[in-house]
């Protein structure tokens, strides 16, 4: 299953790729199945997306660049008012373990390139 950000294109304030994918996956698959799934994403999930991943029961998240790098790319763009709240901290407050792998320095530049021009 793949998903792109639809926040700007469809004017949905919660339309981050991870949130939308978590919603679609929770409709298509059982919670048990999703607990064995991995969500791959270019940037560290924001607090909202981390919550959606948690509620969908997705078992693992892999991301290329930290959220603070995304903030550097977006600057003060009102479409992305970033929290300074790592997804690991969000998941740590939950009642089940979600494995987090990232950031991955070897792919950080490639992950950042996906966002080039999107937020401007």
Say what each PLM segment does.
Residues 13-48:
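Short HxH-centered metal-ligating active-site micro-motif
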Residues 1-7:
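RNase H-like nuclease fold core
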Residues 10-12, 109-110:
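Short, surface-exposed linear segments at secondary-structure transitions and domain or protein termini
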């Amino acid at each position: 299953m793949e998903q792109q950000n639809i926040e700007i294109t469809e004017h949905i304030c919660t339309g981050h790729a991870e949130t939308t994918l978590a919603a679609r996956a929770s409709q298509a698959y059982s919670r048990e199945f999703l607990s064995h799934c991995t969500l791959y994403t270019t940037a560290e999930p924001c607090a909202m997306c981390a919550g959606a991943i948690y509620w969908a029961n997705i078992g693992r998240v892999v991301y290329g660049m930290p959220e603070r790098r995304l903030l550097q790319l977006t600057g003060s763009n009102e479409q992305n008012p970033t929290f300074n709240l790592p997804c690991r901290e969000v998941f740590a407050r939950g009642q089940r373990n979600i494995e987090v792998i990232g950031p991955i320095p070897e792919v950080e530049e490639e992950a950042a390139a996906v966002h080039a021009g999107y937020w401007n």
